[in-house]
Amino acid sequence: MGCLSSEPTAAPAMQPRAPAAVPDDAHNGERVKRRDVTPDGVYLPNANRLAPPMRSPDYVQISTAAAMTLGLVPGRMHRCRCTRCLNLLLTYPEGCRANCAYCGLARHREADHDYADRNFIRVDWPSVPVAQLVETVAGQGAATPFERMCISMITHPNADADTRSVLKAWTGRIAPERVPVSILSNPTTMTRDDVRALRDLGAEIFTVALDACTPALFERTRGRGVGSPHRWAKYWEIFHAARDIFGREKIGMHLIVGMGESERECLEVVQTVKDAGGHSHMFCFFPERGSLMDHLPATPRDQWRRVQLARYLIDYMGVRIDRMRFDEGGRVRDFGLSRAELDAVIAAGIAFRTSGCPGARRADVSACDRPYGDSPPSKIASYPFQPARRDRARIRRQLAGAAP
């Protein structure tokens, strides 16, 4: 069977640090909300000035890669075009009211950054008027570079209604058949009716960012352990509602690898999601600047590559976790395929690309390529392009524990 001979890296204890105190005048975005300034056009994050009071559904934030693709900011991405997915993020002066330990958008960052200036998955997120954004993409017609659009919700009292408003504005000008729409949901504020409404308005895929792979880890990084409102059971409740409403192959689950779970624990969630008719979208833990886990190490590459490979086998190759073998620490020691079969999957390289909602090409290649969202370009975790021969050679060394 397909075994690996590396000596696995031990998982560190991943304990969030305590947050800094938030000044009274910074709570709930008060400094920004008191500004008597009307937002004007695109806002580029700048921590050296006070942000204007921008608010969804009139404004959204977009990833740096999307802003580069649209020509709103200069630059180009290392070894790839910018992105094939237009990622939108709801925005409010109050920001996200959750306090997830690994997230750059967390509530505790009121102490040091206005919401519109906070980094998220390693990059800045410029703010753009929704009307301008929709008209720009609509004007591109069939030539648009985007194969998918995704609305990312945050924890805010208005998030559900504003997500519907942004979705209506988009589908009113851009047919979902031309640019399919995904929703990255916030289960904490949602009901089953909210899920159904998004489907009825034209969303194709519904995803849940569980992120933490065990109930205890979820509680420590996303729940009561950090004064955050999220609950493990609620996330699964909304995921199962989405399965019923959107159907099989139209649901997804975000998972972060390397926050203290074992490889087996992570892959058990992957198998559960697959059995429900969904796919898992994987992120390699990276210490986000300003987060409560920014002092902790990134996921060791041998661990990450094993989980990437095993997840691909479960999601797309029909391999079940009960065919795999694990050591006493829960690390994958056998992937449940012959050596020749496993070598062929590794050689193809697709297992090591960014995972997410599919694009126009094939089901196992994500439109949401999130360039360098979980690693620097010098040490790529999720390849936003097809790995070249030299990349695949490095991946093999990483799987063998012989390369960082």
For every predicted segment, state its role.
Residues 1-19, 27-84, 245, 267-404:
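Auxiliary Fe-S-binding modules of radical SAM enzymes
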Residues 164-178, 230-248, 301-317:
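Alpha-helix-loop-beta-strand connector modules within alpha/beta enzyme cores
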Residues 184-188, 224-225, 238-264, 285, ...:
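Conserved strand-turn element in the central/C-terminal portion of the radical SAM core barrel
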Residues 193-198, 260-274:
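Catalytic cores of alpha/beta
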Residues 107-136, 140-162, 177-194, 201-236, ...:
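Core AdoMet radical
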Residues 147-173, 258-265:
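Conserved glycine-rich "GG(E/T)P / GGGxP" loop and the immediately following alpha-helix
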Residues 97, 111, 145-149, 250-252, ...:
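Conserved mixed alpha/beta catalytic, RNA-binding, or beta-rich assembly cores of soluble enzyme
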Residues 59-109, 148-151:
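N-terminal pre-triad scaffold of radical SAM enzymes
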